[in-house]
């Protein structure tokens, strides 16, 4: 297979359009899957995607169009360029136009993609096998998977962009069932290379929660002080970010639209001193410091490829500070260019402690395991609905006293920001609903007052 760098050079040198950007992504992934406390499959996946974006002058304006293919060879280059140019001409003048970056170099351009493989599980797999043995002896069934992905992205252009980033990430998701499958719980862990994954901690969490489910407590629908683990916080606020584009807010189409026009930037949304930001230099979750966009969307623009990504405060001290911008939308809204970064971090000033510490602070409430099947109900308030899954626990006097029924919940993350009673320490966490979409998230566990359960 031709190297990504050589392919980009071939395409950009052959391009006859005004400018041309090529985005190549090489991805390898190793995985393990198990069911009934028995390993069922393992494998390695290798993928490449090549996106060619043509920029063409049309009637005094600039148009863009792109095509994406896999397994591109040198012989495919002319047809690929023709298709991208045709797509640009058909699209007409781009409403997200901004001057293209030129002559920007970031990262080790010439280095090869470093593939992952089964060796990444060298420490994890034996520990997992031991957990299987213990679970069989104790009549606990384990289901789940682990995967490790390394993706390398190269962005090159006629105008001199030579950008490269590497994104290694792994995760474990595991469900434990016992007592003829009448009890079920879940645990999820994010990792960079599996050297820091504690199977013992996963085992202990699953066993503790299955034990809690030995006592049943029936509770009615209503509003409860609710402890959300950091992963559930990540699920809620991922959805909030997905509706946080400045253009939609400016045009009156989102929860962040201001009555009478404009956006709610500058409005205090949280009752506590809460920080919510993206930062490529955040030590625990380093991320790319440049924009790489294969397609234009409300969240990004192909015209912004190569633009720098710096720290962006979405909420600062509980005040809405920024919304997601392309350079074109920033000009339209007369606000700063604040591109969406590759990580999201939430922290609460002065907060510390674990999920267990938060339980001790709740007199009468609920402890959730995960949120599931999250859907929008009302975009104007960002009212969401969803289900609880794999364990809801009744907390009384600072202790878990038993498991209760699952609920359908109905609440808004924007509203929840104003009802935070307690917060734990920020930790790298795994959302459950959006685990396949978001991996670089650090969140605290939160206690939300009056969380609506139906």
Regions found by a protein language model. Give the residues of each.
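Dual-mode signal for accessory low-complexity, basic/Gly-rich regions
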Residues: 261-454
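Active-site bordering "gate/hinge" segments
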Residues: 1-301, 307, 316-317, 397, ...
